[in-house]
Amino acid sequence: LKIDTQSFRSIIRGHKLQGDKLDEGIKGMFDVDVLCEPSDFKVCLIHTVPYFTGAGMMGVHIIHNVLAHIEGLCVDYCYLPESTVRKALKSNNIPLFGFGTKIPLREFDVLGFSMFFSPNVCNMVHIINYAQIPFLAEQRGEEWPILIAGGVLNTAPEAIAPIFDVMFIGEGEEQVPVIMETIKKMKKEGKKKEDILKAVALIPGCYVPRFYENIFDPSTKRYAGYKKLWDGAPDKIYWQKVDISDPKYNYTIVDYKKDVARNRLYLTKDVEVTRGCVHGCRFCAPFSWYKPYRERNFEGVKEAIKARQDMGTVRMMGLTPTDYSRYNEARDYAISLGIQYDGYSERIDQFERTWDDNRRKKSVCFALECANAEMRRRVNKHLPDDVFWAAFKKAIGAGIIKTKVMCMIGLPFETQKDVIDLHNLMDEMWRVSREIRPMSAIELSVNLFLPKPHTPFQWAAHRESPWMADFVRIYNEKFNDGSYVVFDEKLGRNVVKGWRNVKGSPAGRRLEALLDRADRRFCVPMIKTILKFNIYSEQDWGESNSKLWVGVKTYMQIHYGYDIDDTLRELEFDTPFPWDIIDVGTNREFLWEEWQRSSKAHETEGCNFGCANCGVVSKYPQLNGKSVCSQKKKWFDESNPSGVLQLAPDQIKGGTNG
């Protein structure tokens, strides 16, 4: 079965909704054909965002590049359809299909979902619904595709675990081809789904939820751990990490001149130069996920830059791309080819080093995180006040049009003084910018803190800052009373040249925290509520998720006698976490020690200054001697075959860590 594209185009046009980005959506769905042979093993990569948002995501390109080289495997793609297309699908009972092949998703062998952000869960539910596929893995027999989830959302998988047959944990370049080859071979041999999933469960990084079940405390109704339902299942699932310095990973992502099918996944200007980070902010989950810090070899970076010569622009990508040891060489190489270099948010302490790039920008973005030095010590953000102000003044003085500063509110150990300091920071930013360059634009972006699994703050309670309402009120008063207004001579009127941007509604962030800490009981009520209120992540995340929160809360109370507010409480050291089955490499004892150090406002030095014995190096021997995390020291040798660091307490930067 293939969808008749001409007929469907006509149907879509008849359902055009005002404000819908229909042209982009139709371009993604119909401009290119992906040809599959009848005998091909068919895989569709599903991205839980609209086409115009997701087509440039690097993870999309990496996995597509890996799969496109497997013989006898046909790779298609699908995105969340635009609202007009969704209306047409529903009204005409047409199942959602692969954009390239026009084959309904339910007829593929494997559907691979990219799960990167908590709000994407809403879109994922709708995609499965429009594909006319049963939601729960236990409802899908032999005739249905195998559903696989990939992406960082899988580090806390239990809220969506009942939906998927397989959840891949970590970096996929090495193991994703193994997974597909295994399924392809066994399906060709006529093996049952149960046998296929048992084989996949033994592939590193593969979590097969059906082989485990949650355990609950009968008295408190709280999550109490997990047990295996099949003895052959792994006890833990380890996040997969790849040695990106290996030349075999030197890919340009797509050859957009030759490969028509992948041309729809247009060449992104991003060039990955690093994975991981050495700085150790305690709120940052990617710091734990992507440890240890690794760098791509320079020849691979040059190859990727050159592939973007016709684009005219390139951007180095990584958690902290300016840490790349050959950053300046890569930038100069791009310039020598006539390619304009762009950048992400700047590390304030490296602003001087990258000044040649920054002074040409129209805007810069500084991640300050906290308004005062004590709170920055608590979150382990190694940044003195004078370094920030030096960078801020230099940016304003250089004529950069907009300078954005990002901070958080609702952090552990936060006091009202810390919130007052945010207001003072805003006033000082305004005063300094007026003195240096009166017409410069400044922006203070404030996000609500979220305690993330696998970080030192995973034990923290998720709370709405008791001062959040006051903070927003004072913000509004300052803008309404003219505090931030100047007279623009060109326009001949008063204008606001600094502006507020408070992101992350309390309701939305509360729901994200719940999804991180949720167990499998939450899955069904979540699906029911998303469908009932027709919730998408592109909507007002706060307003929509107030409904979703109430719906899930009511269901859990009625069916399980459990108050979901209890899920967001502060946790003890030995509290069982729903994500305990996932091991990203960092020891629990190390994270607890960091949590205690945060309570005392004590910093721990970054991995580039010394090893704090977090546990990663003992679990990933394939990265032995290739990680800046341990100063490229070979921890695995004849005298220390286990790789466990044998350090005295005074040798550990920042204190002992179990």
Task: Identify the function of each model-found stretch.
Residues 82-229, 456-506, 512-519, 523-534, ...:
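Glycine-rich beta-alpha loop elements in corrinoid/cobalamin-binding modules
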Residues 1-32, 39, 45, 482-658:
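Radical SAM enzyme core and accessory elements
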Residues 57, 262-299, 609, 613-631:
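Canonical Radical SAM [4Fe-4S] cluster-binding loop centered on the CxxxCxxC motif
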Residues 72-84:
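A short beta-strand-loop structural module common to alpha/beta enzyme folds
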Residues 45-49, 302-443, 447, 451:
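Conserved SAM/AdoMet-binding glycine-rich loop
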Residues 43-49, 67, 254-285, 448, ...:
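N-terminal pre-triad scaffold of radical SAM enzymes
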Residues 8, 13-44, 51-52, 209, ...:
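N-terminal [4Fe-4S]-dependent radical SAM core
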Residues 199-209, 319-324, 346-351, 441-451, ...:
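A glycine-rich phosphate-binding loop feature that marks nucleotide/adenosyl-phosphate handling sites
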